[in-house]
Amino acid sequence: MTKAKKKAGRPKGSKNRKGKESELARSKRSDLHWFAKTYLDMDLYPWQVDVLKELNYKESRVALKAANGSGKTSMVAAIAVLWHVISFPDSLVVCTAGVYRQVEAALWPTLKRYVQQLTGGEGFEVTQSGLRFVNGARAIGFSASDPHKAEGWHRQGESNNLLFIVDEAKGIHDDEIFHAVERCQ
């Protein structure tokens, strides 16, 4: 599979960036595919749309197997992280990968780029190890080399939401990390 195409140019509605976060957070139709298309002006492949639709359901568990460079991190995981922190105040997104380099060098820079595109950076703080949004939601990342780091994350905030992303799961050889993720709630 090849990488999803992204239209060149400014995001839709970019002239009115300041109100985007609250408009999105209030929107009852704010699903991940709609978010990617409306706010990031992305054209996604059907398989990416299907994955994002599956992630719309609370308590969903989605496993994705796709080719290298197909957009798993940049077009699926990053969209899910950004959508989640905007849509669910005070919520938490936990991101891990077999090596932290995947989170640090692939996911966070993509998030930073999307945040700039979406808001010009307003309302977000993107650091080397995480993302904070003005509504209190946050995303954190760590290496899956130690299963104990996956322990103890819980749903939080008004929305009672937790999103856990295991990127490049094929590089995680210890099943304990997956058992730890299953116990998080």
Feature names for model-found ranges:
Residues 2-5, 10-185:
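Phosphate/NTP-binding elements of NTP-utilizing enzymes
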